[in-house]
C-alpha cells in the first residue's frame, strides 16, 4: 500500500469506460466550433503535448504542483530519481516492475524533463471515470416468460456446452477483476463448484478504504482507551473550482476516548485512526460526513494483525467484529444494511500499525463483472435449462423479455464457475480512479499469481496508438509474466477508429459488445401491414447475434485490428452487491469483457489439466481463430466488418479444438510492419511503424509491407492472398520465407471504380499446414462522397437499417469551409471528425447541427437501428457553406484638411458552396495589432490584452517562425487562469477565434513545444503575432441587408464607412457576418464571418526584438525586426532610432545593435521606427535581466557594460584600498578610456552589505544602484574627454570574518535540527489538543521553511554538502532555518501553556 497515496492530485479528464448516454437533450441546437476543440497531438519528446498543456494550465491557475507518471529507461530508475530530485520533484511512488515513477513536480519545471537522458516518457496521472448505464429509447418489453438468467449469454459462446462436454469449468485459474471491488460475501461469489473459496484476494489501490493509523495510544482506564487527540483526516478528493484539480479536503475531528473492554494488544499499544466516507455513504444516512473510528491491535505479539471498525459510531469497539487481513483469514463483516448487507473486508494491515485498508464494492460494477466471469450458485439449474432450451434461438427473446422495474434476484452462473477471483479495486465507489492506481493494480495482479486480468474500464482520446501508459503496462506485463489481459473496447461507437485505452494495447485481447436476440415493443401501424391493429406488440427484433450499437469500432489509429473479438454485452444479467439487491441487468463492453475473461479461464483450465502448452499469444490466437463470424442482417443485406467485431463472436469449443490441435507443434511467428509515412496520421503517432493500413483521408497507391518469419526451420512456405479484390499484392500464392529475414511485400490498393463507402479487407499470410492463420494485415480505406456544384454542395441519404445494424456515410470537407450543416428526418446519428473523434457526444437527434470551421478531411455520419424492429428508415442531409469577400483589405486615404467623415467602398461577395438566402450583418470597426515576438524551446511567451465591452470577435493568430519546422502552440486564458481556447496543431501556424468574449483581461500564451535548430539543439524562434478585436460600434453600413446566391454566384455590395475627422490613422478590423436564414434559425449559427481589414491613410509597423533576455552588465547583440503589420512582409530601409543612434533596416527588415542591460529583473529598450506611408512607431521592449554568476572574488571587479561603437571604451586600471576596523571604508578607483564626447557605462559589483555608496568623478553623467541576491551593483555612465577616473566608496561592517562555507553549514545544520524537533513537537501538540489555528500557523512556517530548503537543494543539484561554498545557498538556507525555528517556537509556547494548565 502506498502511504503517500493521499498526497496525489489528479488531473480530471473524462474517460470512457462502461456505457455512455447517447442522446443530446431535446430543444438545444447542437453547435460546434472546431476552434475550441482540444487537441492532444503527437510528440517525440519525454513531455507530451497533453502534459505541456496541463503544465501551462497549472501555471496560469497558480497551482504549485502537478503529478505525472514518468517512465524511465531500463536500468535507469535510480539515476532518474536523482535527476528528478535535483529539479525539486518529489517521488510519491515507484513501480520497479515497469520502471515507472509517480512524481510531484512544479509545473514550470516540466519542460526540463525533456533534457533528462534517463527518462522515456511523461504522462498525466489522469483520472478514469466509469460512464452511466445506457438508456434505450422508445423500447418497451413484456413480462418475462422465464426468470432472467445469464445462461443465454453463456450458451451463445458455447461456455455451458464446453463445461458439460469437457468438464473444465475454470478450476485452477485465477482471474483478477480490476474494477470497483467485489462484494466479498455475495452468495453467487462464495464458492466454486468443488467447494473452494471463490474470492481469494481483496486489494485496494485507491484511497477509498485507506486509514492513517499511525497514532498510537496505551493508556487504558477501566476498559476505556484514552485518545484525547485532534485528527486531521483527508476526507476525499473534491474538485477545486479555482484550479480545476481534484484535491483532498482535510477535516479536523477530535476524539476523547473509546471503549475497548477486554480487547487487548500484546504489546500494550493500540493504533487508532478514522475512516472517512470519502466517496460512499457507508451507513446510508443520506450524507458522506461520517468518520468511523478504527482500532488496530497486535493480537499475537508478531505485529498488528486485527482491526475493528466502529460501524455504529458509538465509540465502542466491544460490539464490533474483529477482522484479520482478508487473504490470510478470509474474514468478512457487515458494515450496514440498505436493500441488503454492505459487506466489507480488511484488505491490508501494516504490521507496524501505521495504516489499514478496508474494501467493499460501493458501486456495483465490479461485482457484476465478477459474476459474469465466475459466478456460481450451488442451487443453480443451468443444466436443466440447457437441456430444455439449448439450440432454440427463440428462447432468447423469451428470456430477455424482462421488466427493468421489476427484477428479482435469480441464479447467476458465470462463464467459468470454477475460476477463482482476485478482487482488485482500482476504481472508487464514485466510479473514478487514477491511472497510477490502475497500473499499480495491474502490476500487483500480474506479479501475484493472476492467470487472467479482466479490465472493464478505459477511455478515449485522439490518436491512440498503444503508447499511453496503461497500454505500455499491459504489453510489458504480458511479456514479463505471461498473464492474459482482457480489456473492454469502449462504448463510443458506432463511429470507426474509436477504441479506447488500454484496449488499444497490442498484447490485449480487446472486446467489443454483441447483442443476443431480445423482445421489443413496437407500435404497429398500417405501414407495417397490420391495418386492423394499432398499439405496441412484442416480438423478436432479430434472430441472430448482432453487434451492440454502442460498441467502439476499430481500427487502431495505426491500422492494427481492434477489437479482437466480441462477446455478449447487451442486457447482461449478473450479480450486484447485496446492499443494492443482489442482481440486475447492465449493458456495455464492460459486460462483454468478463465473458471473454471467463472463456480464457476455461481454456487455461483445460490446458493445465491436459498439460497443453499455452502463453498469452497462443490464447489470443486460438480465441481469434475459433471465433464465429457474425454476418449482420440477412433482410437488409447489411454486413459487419472486422472493425465491428474483430474476428467475431468468441466460441470456446472451437478455440479449444484449435488449442489442442496446435499442442506439441511449434507455430511459426510472423510479424509485419510498414513505415508510418503511409499513414494519414503519421505526425500524430508515437511509433515509427504502422501495423495496418488505415487510409481515412488519403489512399496510398502502393505500400511496402515488411514481413518477417521466425521459426524452427530455415525456410517455410506461406500462402499470401487478399480477402478483397481491391487489395492486390504483387506476390500472391505460395511464397517461401527465410527464417529471421525480412521480406518486402509490395501491395497495390486499386480503388478505381469503388463506390463511396467503407472498405475493409485483410492480407493473409498463412502456413496451410497449421490450424491457424499465422499473420494478417488489416486494411481500412474510406472512399468519401464529394460535395459538387451538381449536387449543390448537399449530400442526402435515405437509409433502411436493421436492428443493431450500422450505416456509415463518409464525405470530404475541403479546406476553407465555413460551416458544416447536418440534419436527419427522424432517427439519431453520430458525427465524427476526420481524426475519428465525435463532435457531439454521442448521438444527435432530430435537431439540426452545425459545425463552424470544420476540420478538413473525411467526415463520418453514422446511424444505427438500436434494438428496434427490422427495417427502420431515416433520411439524412449534410451541406457545406463557404463565402469569400474581395477585396478583403479596404483603403481610405484622407487628404490634408479633409472634413469628410463618410466613405464608400465596393466589394464582391462570392458564394462558393451551397446556395444561400442570407442576411448581411456588418460589424466594425475594431483594433488590429501585429508584432514580432520570440519564444524558446519548451518556453512560454505570455502577453496580456484587455478586451473591451461590445467586442463581437477576438481573433489571435501566430505564424512565420524564424526557425523552420518549429511547433508552437497558441493558448488564450481569462483573468482567472481558465483556458478559453487553444490551437495545438503540430505546426507554428495557429489561430483561435472567440465570438463575443466577455470583457476583461486575457493572457495570450505561446508555447515553444519544439523549437530545434538543424542539428536538433534547443533554440529560440521569432514569430508573428496578430490580435484583432472587432467591435460592433456601427462604423460600417451596407447598401444591402440580404442576398440570395446560388453556388459560385457573386453580388456587388457597397459598404458605407463612417469615421470621425480625427480618427487615428492605421489598420483596423471588421467583419461581414452572413446568416443563412434556414441555418441560423435551426442552429443559431452564421454560415460565415468574413474578416475585412481597413487601412486609414497609413499602414502600421509590426516590430519585434530578439532575444528577450540579458544579463546585468553583459553586452550582447540584439536584433530588431520590422514588418508591415498587414502583410507581415519585411520592411527594408526603415529608419530606426535607439537612444542617440540611428540605423536603417536591411533587406530582411532587421537592425542589429549591441546593448548591455543596466537594471536587474527588467530593463527597457525604446525604439522609434519611421518610413513614408507608415505611422511612426515608438515602442518600448521589456527584456528580462538576470544577475550575473558571481563569486566572492568578483566583488569590486568592475565590468564595462555598454558603450557606442564610436566610444571604443576600455578599462585601463582598477585600484582598491580600505581602512578602518569594525566599520571599514572601501574605495574603488577605476580609470577608463574612450573616444571624446562619447559615453560608456560600467558596472561595479560591491558586497551585498555595502552601505553609504557614493560615486564621484568629473565626467560622471549618472549612476544608479541595483540590489541583487548575491551583491549590489553600481551602474555608472560617463562621458569621455580623455581617460576618465571614477571613484566608488562605501562602508561595510568588517567584524570577525566568517566564510560562506561556514555560514551555509550552520544554516543547513540548524534547519535539520529544528525540522526534527518540529516533527516531535507537532505530534505532541496533536496529542495534547493544541487548537487548529495555532497548528495551522506552525505548519505554515514549517512549509515555508521546506520551500526554502528545496530551493537550496535545487541550486546545489541535490547535494548541499558539496556546495557549501556556493554564495547562492546563503539566502535560502538562512530563511529555511529561521522559518523552521519560528514554527518550533510557536509549538513550544502552545505546549508549555497546555502543560501549565494541568
From Swiss-Prot:
Query: Chief subcellular site?
Result: other
Where does the UniProt entry place glycosylation sites? 152, 222, 228, 240, 257, 262, 298, 327, 406, 651, 663, 739, 792, 893, 908, 917, 929, 1048, 1056, 1084, 1117, 1133, 1140, 1148, 1208, 1233, 1237, 1332
Broad EC category: hydrolase
Instruction: Report if keyword Iron is assigned.
Output: no
GO MF annotation, one: serine-type endopeptidase activity
Q: Does the keyword Cell membrane apply?
A: no
Return the SUPFAM superfamilies for the record.
HCP-like (SSF81901), Subtilisin-like (SSF52743)
Q: Which subcellular locations apply to this protein?
A: Cell envelope
Q: Which residues form the Peptidase S8 domain?
A: 154-656
- Identify the stretch annotated as signal peptide in this record: 1-26
Q: Which UniProt keywords apply?
A: Glycoprotein, Hydrolase, Protease, Serine protease, Signal, Zymogen
Active-site positions on this chain: 179 (charge relay system), 365 (charge relay system), 590 (charge relay system)
Function text: Has endopeptidase activity toward caseins, casein fragments including alpha-S1-casein and synthetic peptides.
Query: Into which family does the record put it?
Result: Belongs to the peptidase S8 family.
Name of the featured protein = Pyrolysin
Source species = Pyrococcus furiosus (strain ATCC 43587 / DSM 3638 / JCM 8422 / Vc1)
Amino acid at each position: 500500500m502506498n502511504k503517500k497515496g493521499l498526497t496525489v492530485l489528479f488531473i480530471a479528464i473524462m474517460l470512457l469506460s462502461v456505457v455512455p448516454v447517447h442522446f443530446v437533450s431535446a430543444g438545444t441546437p447542437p453547435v460546434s466550433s472546431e476552434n475550441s476543440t482540444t487537441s492532444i497531438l503527437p510528440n517525440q519528446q519525454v513531455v507530451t503535448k497533453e502534459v505541456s498543456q496541463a503544465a501551462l494550465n497549472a501555471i496560469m491557475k497558480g497551482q504549485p504542483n502537478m503529478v505525472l507518471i514518468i517512465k524511465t529507461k531500463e536500468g535507469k530508475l535510480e539515476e532518474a530519481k536523482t535527476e528528478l530530485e535535483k529539479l525539486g520533484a518529489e517521488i510519491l511512488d515507484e513501480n520497479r516492475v515497469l520502471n515507472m515513477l509517480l512524481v510531484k513536480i512544479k509545473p514550470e519545471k516540466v519542460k526540463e524533463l525533456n533534457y533528462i537522458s534517463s527518462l522515456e516518457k511523461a504522462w498525466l496521472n489522469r483520472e478514469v471515470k466509469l460512464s452511466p448505464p445506457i438508456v434505450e429509447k422508445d423500447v418497451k418489453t413484456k413480462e418475462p416468460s422465464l426468470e432472467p438468467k445469464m445462461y443465454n449469454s453463456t450458451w451463445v459462446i458455447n461456455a455451458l456446452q464446453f463445461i458439460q462436454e469437457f468438464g473444465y469449468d475454470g478450476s485452477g485459474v485465477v482471474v483478477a477483476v480490476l474494477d470497483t471491488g467485489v462484494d466479498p460475501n455475495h452468495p453467487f461469489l462464495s464458492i466454486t463448484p468443488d467447494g473452494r473459496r471463490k474470492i481469494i484476494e481483496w486489494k485496494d489501490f485507491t484511497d477509498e478504504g485507506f486509514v492513517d493509523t499511525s497514532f498510537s495510544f496505551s493508556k487504558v482506564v477501566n476498559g476505556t482507551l484514552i485518545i484525547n487527540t485532534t485528527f486531521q483526516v483527508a476526507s476525499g478528493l473534491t474538485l477545486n473550482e479555482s484550479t480545476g484539480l481534484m484535491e483532498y479536503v482535510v477535516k479536523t475531528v477530535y476524539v476523547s476516548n473509546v471503549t475497548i473492554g477486554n480487547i487487548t494488544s500484546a504489546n500494550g499499544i493500540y493504533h487508532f485512526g478514522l475512516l472517512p466516507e470519502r466517496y460512499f455513504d457507508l451507513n446510508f444516512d443520506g450524507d458522506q460526513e461520517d468518520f468511523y473510528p478504527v482500532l488496530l491491535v497486535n493480537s499475537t505479539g508478531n505485529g498488528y494483525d486485527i482491526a475493528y471498525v466502529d460501524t455504529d459510531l458509538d465509540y465502542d469497539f466491544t460490539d464490533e467484529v474483529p477482522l484479520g487481513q482478508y487473504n490470510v483469514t478470509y474474514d468478512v463483516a457487515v458494515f450496514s444494511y440498505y436493500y441488503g448487507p454492505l459487506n466489507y473486508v480488511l484488505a491490508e494491515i501494516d504490521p507496524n500499525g501505521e495504516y489499514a485498508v478496508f474494501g467493499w464494492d460501493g458501486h456495483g460494477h465490479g461485482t457484476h463483472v465478477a459474476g459474469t466471469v465466475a459466478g456460481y450458485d450451488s442451487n443453480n439449474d443451468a443444466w436443466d435449462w440447457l437441456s430444455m432450451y439449448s439450440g432454440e434461438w427463440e428462447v432468447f427473446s423469451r428470456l430477455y423479455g424482462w421488466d427493468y422495474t421489476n427484477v428479482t434476484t435469480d441464479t447467476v452462473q458465470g462463464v467459468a464457475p470454477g475460476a477463482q477471483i482476485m478482487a482488485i479495486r482500482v476504481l472508487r465507489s464514485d466510479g473514478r480512479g487514477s491511472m497510477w492506481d490502475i497500473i499499480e493494480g495491474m502490476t500487483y495482479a500480474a506479479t501475484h499469481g493472476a492467470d487472467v486480468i479482466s479490465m472493464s474500464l478505459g477511455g478515449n482520446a485522439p490518436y491512440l496508438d498503444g503508447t499511453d501508459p496503461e497500454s505500455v503496462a499491459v504489453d510489458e506485463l504480458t511479456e514479463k509474466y505471461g498473464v492474459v489481459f482482457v480489456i473492454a473496447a469502449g462504448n463510443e461507437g458506432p463511429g470507426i477508429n474509436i477504441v479506447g485505452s488500454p484496449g488499444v494495447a497490442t498484447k490485449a485481447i480487446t472486446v467489443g459488445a454483441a447483442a443476443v436476440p431480445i423482445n421489443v415493443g413496437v407500435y404497429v401501424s398500417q405501414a407495417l401491414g397490420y391495418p386492423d391493429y394499432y398499439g405496441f406488440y412484442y416480438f423478436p427484433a432479430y434472430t441472430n447475434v448482432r453487434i451492440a450499437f454502442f460498441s467502439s469500432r476499430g481500427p487502431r489509429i495505426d491500422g492494427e485490428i481492434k477489437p479482437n473479438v466480441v462477446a455478449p454485452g447487451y442486457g447482461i444479467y449478473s450479480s450486484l452487491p447485496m446492499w443494492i439487491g443482489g442482481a440486475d441487468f447492465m449493458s456495455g463492453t464492460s459486460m462483454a469483457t468478463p465473458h471473454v475473461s471467463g472463456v480464457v479461464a476455461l481454456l487455461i483450465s483445460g490446458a493445465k489439466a491436459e498439460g497443453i502448452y499455452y502463453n498469452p499469444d497462443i490464447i489470443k490466437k486460438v480465441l481469434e481463430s475459433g471465433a464465429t463470424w457474425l454476418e449482420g442482417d440477412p433482410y437488409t443485406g447489411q454486413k459487419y466488418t472486422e472493425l465491428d467485431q474483430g474476428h467475431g463472436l468468441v466460441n470456446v469449443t472451437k478455440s479449444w479444438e484449435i488449442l489442442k490441435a496446435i499442442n506439441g507443434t511449434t507455430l511459426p511467428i510472423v510479424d509485419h510492419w510498414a513505415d508510418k509515412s503511409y499513414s494519414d496520421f503519421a505526425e500524430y503517432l508515437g511509433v515509427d511503424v504502422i501495423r495496418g493500413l488505415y487510409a481515412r483521408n488519403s489512399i496510398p497507391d502502393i505500400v511496402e509491407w515488411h514481413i518477417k518469419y521466425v521459426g524452427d526451420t530455415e525456410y517455410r512456405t506461406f500462402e499470401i492472398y487478399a480477402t478483397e479484390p481491391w487489395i492486390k499484392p504483387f506476390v500472391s500464392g505460395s511464397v517461401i520465407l527465410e527464417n529471421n529475414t525480412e521480406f518486402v511485400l509490395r501491395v497495390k490498393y486499386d480503388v478505381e471504380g469503388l463506390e463511396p463507402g467503407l472498405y475493409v479487407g485483410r492480407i493473409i499470410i498463412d502456413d496451410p499446414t497449421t490450424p491457424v492463420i499465422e499473420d494478417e494485415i488489416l486494411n481500412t480505406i474510406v472512399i468519401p462522397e464529394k460535395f459538387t456544384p451538381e449536387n449543390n454542395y448537399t449530400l442526402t441519404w435515405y437509409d433502411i437499417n436493421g436492428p443493431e445494424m450500422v450505416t456509415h456515410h463518409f464525405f470530404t470537407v475541403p479546406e476553407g469551409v465555413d460551416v458544416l450543416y447536418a440534419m436527419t428526418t427522424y432517427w439519431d446519428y453520430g458525427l465524427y471528425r476526420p481524426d475519428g473523434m465525435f463532435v457531439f457526444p454521442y448521438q444527435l437527434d432530430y435537431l439540426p447541427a452545425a459545425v463552424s470551421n470544420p476540420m478538413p478531411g473525411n467526415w463520418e455520419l453514422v446511424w444505427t437501428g438500436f434494438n428496434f424492429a427490422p427495417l427502420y428508415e431515416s433520411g439524412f442531409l449534410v451541406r457545406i457553406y463557404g463565402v469569400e469577400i474581395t477585396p478583403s483589405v479596404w483603403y481610405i486615404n484622407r487628404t490634408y484638411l479633409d472634413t469628410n467623415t463618410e466613405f464608400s467602398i465596393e466589394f464582391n461577395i462570392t458564394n462558393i458552396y451551397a446556395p444561400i438566402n442570407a442576411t448581411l450583418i456588418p460589424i466594425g470597426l475594431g483594433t488590429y495589432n501585429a508584432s514580432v515576438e520570440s519564444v524558446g524551446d519548451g518556453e512560454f511567451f505570455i502577453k496580456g490584452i484587455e478586451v473591451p465591452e461590445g467586442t463581437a470577435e477576438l481573433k489571435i493568430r501566430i505564424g512565420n517562425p524564424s526557425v523552420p519546422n518549429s511547433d508552437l502552440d497558441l493558448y488564450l486564458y481569462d483573468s482567472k487562469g481558465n483556458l478559453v481556447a487553444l490551437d495545438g496543431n503540430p505546426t507554428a501556424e495557429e489561430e483561435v477565434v472567440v465570438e463575443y468574449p466577455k470583457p476583461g483581461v486575457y493572457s495570450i500564451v505561446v508555447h515553444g513545444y519544439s523549437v530545434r535548430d538543424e542539428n536538433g539543439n534547443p533554440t529560440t524562434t521569432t514569430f508573428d503575432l496578430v490580435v484583432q478585436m472587432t467591435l460592433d460600434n456601427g462604423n460600417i453600413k451596407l447598401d444591402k441587408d440580404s442576398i440570395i446566391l446560388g453556388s459560385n454566384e457573386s453580388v456587388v455590395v457597397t459598404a458605407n464607412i463612417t469615421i470621425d475627422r480625427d480618427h487615428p490613422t492605421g489598420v483596423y478590423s471588421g467583419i461581414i457576418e452572413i446568416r443563412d436564414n434556414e441555418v441560423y434559425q435551426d442552429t443559431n449559427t452564421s454560415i460565415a464571418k468574413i474578416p475585412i481589414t481597413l487601412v486609414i491613410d497609413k499602414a502600421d509597423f509590426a516590430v519585434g526584438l530578439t532575444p528577450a533576455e540579458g544579463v546585468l552588465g553583459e553586452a550582447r547583440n540584439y536584433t530588431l525586426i520590422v514588418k508591415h503589420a498587414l502583410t507581415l512582409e519585411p520592411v527594408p530601409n526603415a529608419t530606426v532610432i535607439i537612444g542617440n543612434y540611428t540605423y536603417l533596416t536591411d533587406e530582411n527588415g532587421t537592425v542589429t545593435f549591441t546593448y548591455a542591460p543596466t537594471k536587474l529583473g527588467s530593463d527597457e529598450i525604446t525604439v522609434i521606427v519611421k518610413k513614408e506611408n507608415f505611422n511612426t512607431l515608438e515602442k518600448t521592449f521589456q527584456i528580462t535581466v538576470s544577475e550575473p554568476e558571481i563569486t566572492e572574488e568578483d566583488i569590486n571587479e568592475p565590468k564595462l557594460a555598454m558603450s557606442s561603437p564610436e566610444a571604443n571604451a576600455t578599462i585601463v586600471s582598477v585600484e582598491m584600498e580600505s581602512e578602518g576596523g569594525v566599520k571599514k571604508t572601501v574605495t574603488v578607483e577605476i580609470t577608463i578610456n574612450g573616444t571624446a564626447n562619447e559615453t560608456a557605462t560600467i558596472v561595479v559589483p560591491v558586497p551585498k552589505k555595502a552601505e553609504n555608496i557614493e560615486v564621484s568623478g568629473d565626467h560622471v553623467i549618472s549612476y544608479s544602484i541595483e540590489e541583487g541576491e548575491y551583491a549590489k551593483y553600481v551602474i555608472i555612465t560617463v562621458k569621455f574627454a580623455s581617460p576618465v577616473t571614477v571613484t566608488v566608496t562605501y562602508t561595510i561592517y568588517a567584524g570577525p570574518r566568517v566564510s560562506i562555507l561556514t555560514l551555509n553549514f550552520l544554516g543547513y545544520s540548524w534547519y535539520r535540527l529544528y525540522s526534527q524537533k518540529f516533527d516531535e513537537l507537532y505530534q505532541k501538540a496533536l496529542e495534547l489538543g493544541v487548537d487548529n489555528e495555532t497548528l495551522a500557523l506552525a505548519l505554515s512556517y514549517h512549509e515555508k521553511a521546506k520551500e526554502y530548503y528545496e530551493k537550496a537543494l535545487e541550486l546545489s543539484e541535490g547535494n548541499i554538502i558539496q556546495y557549501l561554498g556556493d554564495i547562492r545557498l546563503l539566502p535560502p538556507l538562512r530563511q529555511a532555518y529561521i522559518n523552521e525555528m519560528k514554527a518550533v517556537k510557536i509549538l513550544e509556547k502552545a505546549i508549555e501553556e497546555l502543560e501549565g494548565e494541568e
